[in-house]
Amino acid sequence: MSINSITSYLGISGRNFIVFILVGFFAIQNLAFQIIFRLNIPYSIDFSDVFSPVFNQIVKDEFSLFITKGIHIILFPKLISYPNFYLNSFDVVNLTYIYWIVTSITLFVMYLMIKQTDKRLFWTLIPISAFLYNPLTSSGYWMVGMLSWYFPMLGITSIIYLLNRKTINLKIFASGVSLAIFSTFSILLGVVSWIAGITVLLKAVSEKRLENKKWILLWIISSIIVGFCYLFLTYGTTDSETHFEVLFSFTGFSFISNFIASSFRLKFEILMLLAGTL
């Protein structure tokens, strides 16, 4: 069977077929890496933050799902880990497969986002998948601890896709709020999901794609309610004082800009600031 007949059967262009093949290659080689080596290393930099509480929950019957790491509430990674630890004798190999599934779903949502906006950008899935499935950055050592970081990635990506539609109903909105809560209670970085959601909604209103502005108000109310719940759960859980005023200083701006531009690895700080700002 020729490539032309395959692409005709699938209803995609030859260029997109090449993108599909390359993305599939990166995904398969990463999964093969996990299956062949089965790196069951029950330790990572975030082990004590995610798995020690789960261990105490099972062994000592201590309710520890809401135990915080500083001001991080790593709830959903613990909920995912709990049945695996309990039923699988604390083997963490299965969690590396969950990482692969989460990454693949995120990449698929990115595909839907591109299809929703500009199909000419399908080629960007190649470098994105190369980074996400790179064994050097997703080894068995890091995968287990990285679940708490990849959950917000999935949540934020899905929120942007859902709220960027021409029409928003209660079901779509509730799904967006649920994903934002999922991201927020996976790690503190997940609060960005609320910013992503309001940004998409405001953009839709400015472009006159969203006539009913009640969704913006409901999104703000939801974020405030969840924010108060988060502060209630984290209040008094850390010995170090939290200085929120720093966020509104140049130091806070510099930190956020450098964080956004971290993937560029620029040599000078001023370049990182410019990249993060732009």
For the regions a language model picked out, list residue spans one by one:
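Membrane-interface alpha helices of multi-pass inner-membrane proteins
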Residues: I172-T199
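Transmembrane-helix motifs of polytopic, lipid-linked glycan transferases
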Residues: Y97-T124, S158-L162
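Transmembrane alpha-helices of multi-pass, membrane-embedded glycan-processing enzymes
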Residues: S81-F85, L95-V109, S148, P152-G155, ...
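Membrane-interface transmembrane helices that cradle and orient dolichyl/undecaprenyl
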Residues: F151, I156-F173
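Start-transfer (signal-anchor) and selected internal transmembrane alpha helices
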Residues: M1-N30
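Membrane-lumen/periplasm interface segments of multi-pass, membrane-embedded glycan/lipid transferases
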Residues: Y43-N94, G227-L278
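Aromatic- and kink-enriched transmembrane "portal" helix at the membrane-lumen/periplasm boundary
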Residues: W123-L154
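Perimembrane helix-loop-helix junctions
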Residues: N4-S5, V192-F228
